[in-house]
């Protein structure tokens, strides 16, 4: 009896630990511990067992302040952002628009979006421990996804692929976009068509190249290697596009330059427009342009830019819903498990930047 009393006294006197301390002891994120303790989706069974055992052993006590849900978000979402930068530090306006809308929609659902940047995997690990779910937006090494998987943090990858089951991929069908763009230009009579993308190691740019070449072959349009412009990371911006296109467009013989160019973003298309204006080419009379993203500015240009609309409201709602499901948002407990890959199908928005080269029918 005396021994039992002594044991009880020892447990009572032992200082309980909080979720942050337990995360540090186990080397996993606070978000993962929270999901494990609440039996939420997205936690490896072995990890869940480790967390529950540690909670019993160390006498875990929830932080009372963290329970005040009226004052704090129900879910913390870390948006890991790795954009391409312009020479002055500017960023693709299409990417910034997505982030702004994500923040607004998530806030309306008691979710907090934190935009995060990291230089190495150690920084990634440190930042990941402070959020419940991650969203990756930009260009990343595959090692980042392995790191997040090892931490047990569920993640959403926009325009990227992953082999890890805890990571959901939201993929715009850029292959379809390139194919549709070529079909439209071919219908207008264009047979000299160029393509401008970023590095082909990135999923969306690879899709653009594949769809572009496939469509050219279907229409028996020659594939001109020098018109397949793959911008390096440092030049994947408006000014880099302008510099890359000037040598292709500065020729006296119009048959030696493309009559139309397809771009993998509106930002790059603005660079093509700038190059054309610098050497005196008219859009669309001398050069037709098609962008991608449908940023607000594209409709205000003269002429307005033909582009692909990514349906941003639907895209933002999709990412928000997935974040809520993966992070265990109270309103998403009964939702079915999401698909591993979800495709977004952009639509071609025809405006004034593409000219028809076919002659008018004779009366």
Give the ranges of each region predicted by the language model:
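Flexible loop/turn connectors
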Residues: 242, 246-363
């Amino acid at each position: 009896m005396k021994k039992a009393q002594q044991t009880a006294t020892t447990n009572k006197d032992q200082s309980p630990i909080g979720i942050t301390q337990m995360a540090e002891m186990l080397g996993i994120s606070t978000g993962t511990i929270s999901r494990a303790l609440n039996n939420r989706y997205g936690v490896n069974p072995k990890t869940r067992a480790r967390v529950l055992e540690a909670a019993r052993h160390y006498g875990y006590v929830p932080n009372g302040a963290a329970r005040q849900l009226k004052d704090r978000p129900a879910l913390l979402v870390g948006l890991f952002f790795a954009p391409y930068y312009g020479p002055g530090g500017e960023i693709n306006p299409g990417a910034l628009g997505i982030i702004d809308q994500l923040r607004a929609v998530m806030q309306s659902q008691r979710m907090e979006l934190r935009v995060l940047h990291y230089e190495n995997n150690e920084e990634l690990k440190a930042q990941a421990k402070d959020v419940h779910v991650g969203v990756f937006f930009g260009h990343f090494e595959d090692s980042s996804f392995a790191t997040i998987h090892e931490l047990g943090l569920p993640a959403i990858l926009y325009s990227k692929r992953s082999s890890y089951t805890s990571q959901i991929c939201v993929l715009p069908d850029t292959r379809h976009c390139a194919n549709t763009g070529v079909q439209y230009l071919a219908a207008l009579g264009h047979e000299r068509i160029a393509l401008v993308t970023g590095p082909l190691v990135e999923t969306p740019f690879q899709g653009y190249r594949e769809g572009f070449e496939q469509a050219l072959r279907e229409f028996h349009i020659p594939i001109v290697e020098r018109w397949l412009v793959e911008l390096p990371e440092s030049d994947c911006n408006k000014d880099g596009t302008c510099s890359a296109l000037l040598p292709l467009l500065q020729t006296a013989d119009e048959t030696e330059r493309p009559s139309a160019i397809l771009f993998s973003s509106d930002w790059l298309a603005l660079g093509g427009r700038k190059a054309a204006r610098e050497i005196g080419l008219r859009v669309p009379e001398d050069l037709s342009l098609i962008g991608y993203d449908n940023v607000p500015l594209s409709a205000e240009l003269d002429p307005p830019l033909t582009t692909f609309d990514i349906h941003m409201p639907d895209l933002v709602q999709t990412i928000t819903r997935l974040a809520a499901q993966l992070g265990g948002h109270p309103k998403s407990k009964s939702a079915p498990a999401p698909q591993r890959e979800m495709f977004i199908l952009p639509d071609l928005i025809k405006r004034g930047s593409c000219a028809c080269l076919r002659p008018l029918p004779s009366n």
